[in-house]
A protein has these predicted regions:
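Short hydrophobic beta-strand element within catalytic cores of glycosyltransferases
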Residues: 305-313
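Acidic donor-binding loop of glycosyltransferase active sites
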Residues: 279-294, 307
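A short, active-site helix/loop in glycosyltransferases that binds the activated sugar's phosphate group
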Residues: 152-192
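Conserved donor-binding/catalytic core segment of Leloir-type glycosyltransferases
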Residues: 5, 202-223, 229-233, 242
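Nucleotide-activated donor-binding/catalytic signature segment of Leloir-type glycosyltransferases, i.e.
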Residues: 251-272
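Short alpha-helical donor nucleotide-sugar binding micro-motif in glycosyltransferases
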Residues: 151, 268-269, 276-281, 303
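N-terminal subdomain of nucleotide-sugar transferases
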Residues: 1-55, 60, 64, 152
Length: 385
């Protein structure tokens, strides 16, 4: 019997990229009766139906049959949650549960500051590297030494793309420890129902004769939606651009686009509506501009629906590993609004190219970024340890 402890930032019902990967890993191990697992994370205000979490509470519950220890938080600084109870809860689970393998989802500077002294020498340590600390430059410098200690202690470092290994100033120094396990999408979450097909048909009918472009994500600087809005101004009236999501830049984006009738802001998009727009669109727009976009799950999802993608070049990011320039879509120079508009126009003018890239996009996702692939890779990884 192997015991595995995952250290995630948060967990369902709070859903972000890291949390989804942690949940996928936990799900992938449920079928192995020789594995016992637990998860520890920060608590956060979040709700999904009757499932309700409160940030300040420390609670033990379960998700998908896996025990989750949620540590109450008293503050959040530079996106990092802070908790008085976390050190005690972590020490307790390390002693009582005595995991054979600990998986730390990085970055998590707060937990990293006290994890290593608590970690028994014979415990295998997997550092699951989601992204470099790039936005908070002061924090990055402050925790430089800590990060090196984590990498030194790690028995294995998991990256989500070879691009990130090559482009990270940290991972590139520890290539021998690195293994690439791409993030994944799950087919069952993206299977259209009859209702969804009807919604997609309605979207097409409402925009008959138009080239539909769809982009979705949080409205924050690194997502690059301001560049998509600017590119729209350079397009002709054949185009309709639907932008899903919300965030700190939503109002600024709407102000920027107020005289552009080609753009429609959808707000927060339900899972059903998201699939409907994936189905209905002609082109998937993914305008992220920095390495904070380490991979691009929404990009992979759009490609899964056989849509050509238009992305920017982001050195060291997995975005350009997911969308292959000239194979599954078009890649534009970073932040080049004119090039982005030209790429959309090129695809609009060439239905055969759209179909060619779209088919290749779907094939690439099916071959490299599906849940079954992640599950096999995680099983192999655990077997090695």
């Amino acid at each position: 019997m192997k015991k595995i402890l995952q250290i995630s930032n948060y967990q369902y019902p709070h859903i972000g990229g890291i949390e989804q990967v942690a949940r996928d890993i936990a799900d992938s191990l449920l079928d192995d009766k020789e594995i016992e697992q637990k998860m520890i994370c920060f608590n956060e205000d979040a709700q999904d139906g009757d499932y309700l979490c409160h940030r300040k509470e420390t609670v033990h519950d379960s998700v998908d049959g896996v025990e989750v220890i949620r540590c109450g938080c008293f503050a959040k600084v530079a996106s990092q949650s802070l908790s008085f109870t976390y050190p005690h809860e972590l020490k307790k689970v390390l002693q009582d549960f005595a995991p054979d393998i600990v998986i730390l989802h990085y970055p998590n500077p707060f937990v990293s500051s006290f994890l290593l002294p608590m970690l028994p020498k014979n415990t295998k340590f997997i550092l699951y590297w989601h992204l470099d600390i790039t936005k908070q430059k002061v924090l990055g410098k402050l925790f430089h030494g800590q990060t090196l200690h984590l990498l030194e202690r790690a028995d294995k470092v998991i990256a989500t793309s070879p691009n990130y290994v090559d482009g990270s100033p940290y991972l590139s120094q520890y290539r021998a420890k690195c293994e690439v396990i791409p993030n994944c999408i799950r087919m069952e979450r993206l299977t259209p129902t009859a209702t969804i097909y009807k919604k997609a048909e309605l979207i097409r009918k409402e925009n008959e004769g138009k080239i539909l472009c769809f982009g979705v994500g949080r409205h924050v600087p690194y997502k690059g939606f301001t560049y998509l809005v600017k590119a729209s101004k350079l397009l002709d009236d054949r185009f309709r651009i639907h932008i899903g999501g919300k965030g700190e830049l939503t109002q600024a984006l709407k102000e920027e686009a107020k005289d552009d009738n080609k753009i429609q802001f959808l707000g927060r998009v339900s899972d059903e509506d998201m699939i409907a727009y994936y189905l209905a669109c002609d082109i998937f727009c993914f305008p992220s501009i920095t390495k904070n976009e380490a991979f691009g799950i929404a990009l992979a999802e759009g490609m899964y629906f056989a849509k050509p993608a238009v992305t920017f070049t982001i050195p060291g990011s997995g975005v350009n590993y997911v969308n292959l320039a000239g194979v599954t879509g078009i890649e534009c120079s970073n932040g080049d609004v004119q090039a982005y508009a030209d790429a959309l126009t090129k695809l609009a003018n060439d239905p055969e190219l759209r179909e060619k890239y779209g088919k290749a996009a779907k094939r690439r996702v099916e071959e490299h970024f599906m849940y079954d692939g992640l599950k096999r890779a995680i099983w192999d990884l655990i077997a090695e340890m």
